Structures are given as structure tokens and as C-alpha cells.
Amino acid sequence: MAKRGKNKIEWDNTDWEQEEEEIIWVSKSEIKRDAEALKKLGEKLVDLTKAKLEKIPLEEKLLEAIELAQRLQKEARRRQLQYIGKLLRNIDVEPIQDALEKLENKHQQQQAMLHKLEMLRDTLIDNPEAITQFLEQHPDADRQHLRNLVRAAQKEKAQNKPPKAYREIFQYLKDFMLED
């Protein structure tokens, strides 16, 4: 047992392993990279529309800063983005990143669906058996309307006319698939 002044320290009873705190060293470069990543997250938030911003869990102060940055230009916008990055450093950004990722993923899913519909439309026009297969898979589809549109699109294609029925098939397929 060691004594020091008025304070008594009992060395035998002290468990050094429990009292040691882990010190995590972070390099200056890593801090800068993290700050830059948060600034880029702030830029993504500033580029969103007001409707999309409402779907993301943001603190009031951060939301006000983002709305202000949307109105600013040039150097003032750059300074405001720095400020948004600073605000993001003080909060947990994981829920914000998750919500932003969901919004971006939803857009990609919509693009993929539209691409599939375009391919289906082309298949329906080029292959007469594809209409029968489509109608077997989707018995709720309007058989007569779809066949008429396909015939009209084939006729337009043969006569080099503007693709009015071609667009109507896409719109019909899009409306039909969204109902399901």
C-alpha cells in the first residue's frame, strides 16, 4: 500500500485492467475524410426536393440550414454546406443515410421496372405469341384492347408512322402493372 499526501491509494485493491480506458487515435487525414463525407451528404440533402426532405428524419436546425442553402448561390452556398457538414458531425447520421439510401433505391427500382415494361412492349409487338403468354400470366388484362394496340403499333411500324400506339401500349402496361 502506497500513501501520497492526504489521499490514500491502495495499490493492492486497484484493478488496473478495469480502469484503463481505450484511447483511440484518429489521424488528422481521417478526420478530414470524415468531414468531407459529411459535407457530401449535406450536398445530397441540399439537392433533394422539399417533399423528399420531409421523408428524412432531420433536426429542425439542420432542416433550416438545408432550406437556406437551397436558396443561396456560389460562395454563400459553399459556406452554408460547410456549416451543414459541421451540424452533421454533431448528430447521428446513420438514420439520415438510411433514409437517403431508400429514396435512391426506390428511384432505381422504378427505372428498372420501366425498362422491363419497355422490353415487354417490344416483345409484344415483335412476337405474336408473346401476347398469349402475357394474357395467360395476367388474366385481368384487357385482352381486346391490348391486341388492338399491338396491331396498331405493328401497322404504324410497317408504314413508318409516328409511334402513337407504341406509346399507348407502354402506358397501358405501366397502368396495369401499377394496379397490381
From Swiss-Prot:
<keyword id="KW-0699">rRNA-binding</keyword>
<dbReference type="Pfam" id="PF04751">
    <property type="entry name" value="DarP"/>
</dbReference>
<dbReference type="GO" id="GO:0043022">
    <property type="term" value="F:ribosome binding"/>
</dbReference>
<dbReference type="GO" id="GO:1902626">
    <property type="term" value="P:assembly of large subunit precursor of preribosome"/>
</dbReference>
<keyword id="KW-0694">RNA-binding</keyword>
<comment type="function">
    <text>Member of a network of 50S ribosomal subunit biogenesis factors which assembles along the 30S-50S interface, preventing incorrect 23S rRNA structures from forming. Promotes peptidyl transferase center (PTC) maturation.</text>
</comment>
<dbReference type="InterPro" id="IPR006839">
    <property type="entry name" value="DarP"/>
</dbReference>
<dbReference type="GO" id="GO:0005829">
    <property type="term" value="C:cytosol"/>
</dbReference>
<keyword id="KW-0963">Cytoplasm</keyword>
<dbReference type="InterPro" id="IPR023153">
    <property type="entry name" value="DarP_sf"/>
</dbReference>
<comment type="similarity">
    <text>Belongs to the DarP family.</text>
</comment>
<protein>
    <recommendedName>
        <fullName>Dual-action ribosomal maturation protein DarP</fullName>
    </recommendedName>
</protein>
<dbReference type="GO" id="GO:0019843">
    <property type="term" value="F:rRNA binding"/>
</dbReference>
<keyword id="KW-0690">Ribosome biogenesis</keyword>
